[in-house]
């Protein structure tokens, strides 16, 4: 296919137009007075959201060259979301500012490669300062503050803090849609393990890239399954008794067996999601036994004379719900007998007391937490489905932000952490275009606060200057200058750091781009019937 090529300044300007198109759509959502964005859906009601990455994922531009710029910024938002789970709008705003300031200097004749070096040195120093500024987070109140700032809602903040208190900071917290209009917290017996679906064709929710199974059977074996004949007898029994979904936990699934299960899933005849068994060696056997006890099933292993092709329905476990992601499986509401679960917990506690190996003790404690800790389920309710989806996105973001805060600590929120570190970049001693790179980062660091102020209907530059001179932060909700940490307006250090690193990475790529290559738009083929309109007059030939 023929390609279109554009060079130098034309190429960089096309990328900038794409960057701006996406950033302008996303940045209106920043801060407590940020607005919403409405996204049309092919089917059903539109989505209303203020989540940066959700908006970014929906944007495709008609012009191929501009679209490249938009996709690069989309990568900033997505990467920040993957690493920190929040801060996607901040990352987008930073990327736009770095690109804008950088391209001004490149157009004026600066060397982009040397500017890039200056940007990298400045970001390295800024990240060091963010880490040094971070305060560890301990109390339930501090956790609630982080979640409140992220979700822009006190009640959600308190709910997440309560969930973390109940299942521990490393516990499993999931967010589900509720039938009612209230949002509440429920702690359910459940467990998670770090294995995801074997094939992406098994997912049921393409937006979240996960498989959700309600009231499924759970088939547990330590075998590698490659022949579908081994599975057929038990799967036929499942189909005859109401065709419930099935979670298959096995050593591996391959060849004909995998192909057949995927084909049946795509046809809608049988919904089987397969995951590899967690752990290794003897620990794997113990973990499979834990899952079996939790779900009321049996581990089908030839070591005790059980064969897969002879499996009965009563050997299968069940659970209220299972969610399988790319690298994690969460089992909620296992149907195992309480007495057996308690017996297993007591057995693991005894092993913890007796073991002399620190490594074994750590792994046993992990198993104990999975069996005893349970899963906290936040059930999201709202008056309409559109509102519920928007609320669920905010809770997901707040949960991710809170986990990030527990991991790396907190810094002053509302964009003030970025403004506070601008003066520390004076210590980065560089010359010429490299110094220009440092200055570009300094100007870009003002941008999140400027945008928060603009969204609150104030003059951003005035607010930035006041924050720089007073050393306080700006509370956009009350429009006051306050000590941000004391006021509970805080951001996770991990989110702040990731947003800056990812924005700088993509901005440096845009600045050092010299050529863009894209497919040439195809001309529409002429309609072969268009020239035959005059044939209608042949009726008179009779």
Swiss-Prot record:
Transmembrane segments: none annotated. It is found in: Cytoplasm. One of its GO terms (molecular function) is isomerase activity. ATP binds at residues 29-32, 86-90, 414, 491. It catalyses: ATP + H2O + a folded polypeptide = ADP + phosphate + an unfolded polypeptide. Forms a cylinder of 14 subunits composed of two heptameric rings stacked back-to-back. Interacts with the co-chaperonin GroES. HAMAP family: CH60. This is Chaperonin GroEL. It comes from Desulforamulus reducens (strain ATCC BAA-1160 / DSM 100696 / MI-1). The lineage of its organism: Bacteria, Bacillati, Bacillota, Clostridia, Eubacteriales.
């Amino acid at each position: 296919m023929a390609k279109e090529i554009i060079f130098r300044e034309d190429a960089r300007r096309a990328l900038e137009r794409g960057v701006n198109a996406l950033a302008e759509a996303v940045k209106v959502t920043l801060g407590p007075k940020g607005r919403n964005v409405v996204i049309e859906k092919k089917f059903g009601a539109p989505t209303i959201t203020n989540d940066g990455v959700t908006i970014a994922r929906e944007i495709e531009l008609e012009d191929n060259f501009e679209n490249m710029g938009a996709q690069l910024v989309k990568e900033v938002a997505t990467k920040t979301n993957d690493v920190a789970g929040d801060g996607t709008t901040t990352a987008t705003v930073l990327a736009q500012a770095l690109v804008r300031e950088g391209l001004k200097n490149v157009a004026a004749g600066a060397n982009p490669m040397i500017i890039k070096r200056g940007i990298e040195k400045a970001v390295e120093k800024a990240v060091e300062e963010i880490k040094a500024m971070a305060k560890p987070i301990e109390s339930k109140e501090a956790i609630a503050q982080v979640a409140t700032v992220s979700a822009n809602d006190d009640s959600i903040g308190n709910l997440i803090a309560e969930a973390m208190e109940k299942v521990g900071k490393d516990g499993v917290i999931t967010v589900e849609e509720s039938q009612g209009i209230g949002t509440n917290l429920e702690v359910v017996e459940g467990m998670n393990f770090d294995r995801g679906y074997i094939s992406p064709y098994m997912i049921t929710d393409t937006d979240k890239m996960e498989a959700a199974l309600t009231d499924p059977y759970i088939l547990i074996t330590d075998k590698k399954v490659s022949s579908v004949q081994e599975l057929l007898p038990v799967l036929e029994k499942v189909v005859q008794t109401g065709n419930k979904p099935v979670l298959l936990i096995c050593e591996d699934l391959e060849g004909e067996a995998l192909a057949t299960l995927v084909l049946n899933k795509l046809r809608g005849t049988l919904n089987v999601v397969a995951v590899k068994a967690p752990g290794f060696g003897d620990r794997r056997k113990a973990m499979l036994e834990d899952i079996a006890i939790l779900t009321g099933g049996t581990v089908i292993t030839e070591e005790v004379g059980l064969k897969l092709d002879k499996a009965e329905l009563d050997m299968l476990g069940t659970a209220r719900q299972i969610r399988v992601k790319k690298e994690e499986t969460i089992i909620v509401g296992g149907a195992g007998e309480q007495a057996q679960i308690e017996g297993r917990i007591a057995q693991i506690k005894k092993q913890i007391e007796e073991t002399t190996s620190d490594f074994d003790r750590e792994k046993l404690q992990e198993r104990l937490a999975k069996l005893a800790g349970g899963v906290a389920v936040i059930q999201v309710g709202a008056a309409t489905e559109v509102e519920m989806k928007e609320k669920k996105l905010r809770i997901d973001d707040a949960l991710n932000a809170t986990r990030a805060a527990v991991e790396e600590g907190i810094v002053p929120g509302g964009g003030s952490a970025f403004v506070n570190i601008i003066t520390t970049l004076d210590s980065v001693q560089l010359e010429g275009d490299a110094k220009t790179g440092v200055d570009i980062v300094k100007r870009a660091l003002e941008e999140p606060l400027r945008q928060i102020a603009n969204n609150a209907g104030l003059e951003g530059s005035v607010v930035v200057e006041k924050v720089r001179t007073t050393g306080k932060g700006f509370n956009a909700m009350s429009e006051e200058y306050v000590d941000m940490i004391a006021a509970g307006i805080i951001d996770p250090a991990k989110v702040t750091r990731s947003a800056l690193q990812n924005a700088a990475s993509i901005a440096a790529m845009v600045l050092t781009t010299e050529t863009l290559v894209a497919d040439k738009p195809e001309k529409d083929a002429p309609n072969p019937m268009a020239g035959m309109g005059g044939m209608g007059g042949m009726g008179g030939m009779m």
